[in-house]
Regions:
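C-terminal structured "cap/appendage" subdomains that terminate the fold
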Residues: 316-354
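Small/polar, glycine/serine/threonine/aspartate-rich low-complexity segments that form flexible
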Residues: 12-38, 161-180, 209, 222-262, ...
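A short glycine-centered flexible hinge/capping loop motif at secondary-structure junctions
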Residues: 113-117, 323-327, 364-368
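Long amphipathic alpha-helical coiled-coil segments
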Residues: 153, 157-158, 360-370
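Amphipathic alpha-helical coiled-coil scaffold segments and their short linker/junction regions
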Residues: 1-3, 35, 49, 55, ...
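Periplasmic alpha-helical coiled-coil/stalk elements that build and connect Gram-negative outer-membrane
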Residues: 49, 58, 65-183, 294, ...
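Sec/SRP-type N-terminal targeting helices
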Residues: 2-3, 29, 43-71, 97, ...
Length: 383
């Protein structure tokens, strides 16, 4: 597109064999040889070509920003599914630990029943509680496998191919105490969707200038320089030199309003792009504010869940000790064990939700991802 600002130069060479008609006076057949250069230049007086270059450059930047948007979305989806995987693993670990604890409780109740210190209903209630916990484990295992498979597919691998790589105990990644959103201008500069919308607006604005320039006269200059001769050997001689210069000024005098309508249509397209950009900015700011509020609430919720889980563990241990000492009934043991399982499971869910909302916040801010992150993840997976 930039080449439109400069003259175009072409070179040519050829030979022509001709014979005149007999009824206008027959002349001997002759061959004419020629070689030379032609140059043409449309001077960009009113900026139409420059506006076209600006529009093309802005379109290219918008496409690049759209690609960045896809990359950010992919990285966010990978991170979210990884958190889902860790959540299922944590909840599975909690369920299995509680299953082991309830099995111990069942054994204690069975011994007390054999010693005549507990009723048979206590044994059956302990067994019921244990089996209810066992029944919830398969669903968590299915969720874990689904998260592993989804993560593999997102990284371009076949389902199940990451199972060995992701094996082992993996804690939740740490989270920052606070996230600085920065000023709105920072968000506008970072978010790929807003960059794409702004570049689209710039392209449509440039096209308005391009349409306007078409309504004004165009100035064209031309030049040719070469040689002509009746023999190839004579080309290049002083007598064979030929040259010319030309110039033209052209303007549309009447087109039925076509060019004027083109300007009006493009102006409407530019207005649509402006409205889309403004709407995108407001939606982005709203998304950031909502994500900040959600993350702040998540941190408070996690702190409360941690305290509740700690208290539930202490209560479960105390009630078991009291029961073994004959100072508490078995219903209290069952109640505190169920409360502990629920509190620990809710804590794991809250921990995962907080990190998922942090991912949403980073995505809303248009930052938080290092350049090339998707490519690096793919390389690690392939190796």
């Amino acid at each position: 597109a930039v080449g439109g600002l400069f003259p175009s130069v072409t070179g040519s060479t050829g030979a022509t064999r001709s014979r005149s008609a007999a009824n206008i006076g027959a002349l001997p057949a002759r061959t004419t040889y020629d070689a030379g250069f032609d140059a043409a230049w449309e001077i960009d007086i009113f900026g139409g070509t420059r506006r076209g270059i600006e529009a093309a450059t802005a379109d290219q930047a918008a496409v690049a920003a759209d690609l960045d948007k896809v990359r950010v979305s992919l990285v966010a989806e990978v991170a979210r599914n990884y958190i889902d995987l860790l959540s299922y693993r944590r909840r599975l670990s909690i369920a299995r630990d509680n299953l082991a604890s309830q099995s111990e409780t069942l054994q204690i109740v069975a011994w007390r029943y054999q010693a005549g210190l507990a009723a048979s209903t206590d044994v059956e209630q302990a067994r019921t509680s244990r089996e209810q916990t066992r029944a919830g484990i398969p669903d968590l295992e299915v969720g874990q496998v689904a998260a592993e498979n989804r993560l593999a597919v997102l990284l371009g691998s076949s389902p199940g191919s990451l199972r060995v790589m992701l094996a082992g105990d993996r804690p939740f990644p740490p989270v920052p105490a606070s996230v600085g959103a920065g000023i709105p201008a920072d968000i506008l500069a970072r978010r790929p969707d807003l960059v794409a919308a702004e570049r689209t607006l710039a392209a449509e604005t440039a096209r308005v200038g391009q349409r306007l320039a078409q309504r004004f006269p165009s100035l064209n200059l031309g030049a040719s320089f070469g040689w002509q001769a009746y023999s190839f050997a004579a080309l290049g001689g002083s007598g064979s030199l030929a040259r010319s210069l030309s110039g033209s000024l052209a303007a549309t005098l009447f087109d039925g309003g076509r060019l004027k309508s083109a300007v009006a249509i493009q102006s409407a397209v530019q207005e649509q792009a402006l409205i889309a950009y403004r709407s995108g900015v407001l939606a982005a700011l709203e998304e950031v504010e909502n994500a900040l509020a959600a993350y702040a609430a998540d941190r408070e919720r996690v702190e409360a869940r941690q305290a509740a889980a700690e208290a539930a563990r202490n209560a479960a241990q105390l009630s078991r000790n009291l029961y073994q000492s004959g100072l508490a009934d078995f219903q209290k043991v069952l109640e505190t064990e169920r409360t502990r399982l629920s509190a620990e499971d809710n804590l794991a869910i809250a921990e995962a939700t907080m990190r998922s909302d942090l991912i949403k916040l980073y995505k809303a801010l248009g930052g938080g991802w290092e350049a090339g992150a998707v490519q690096e993840i793919s390389k690690d997976t392939a190796s």
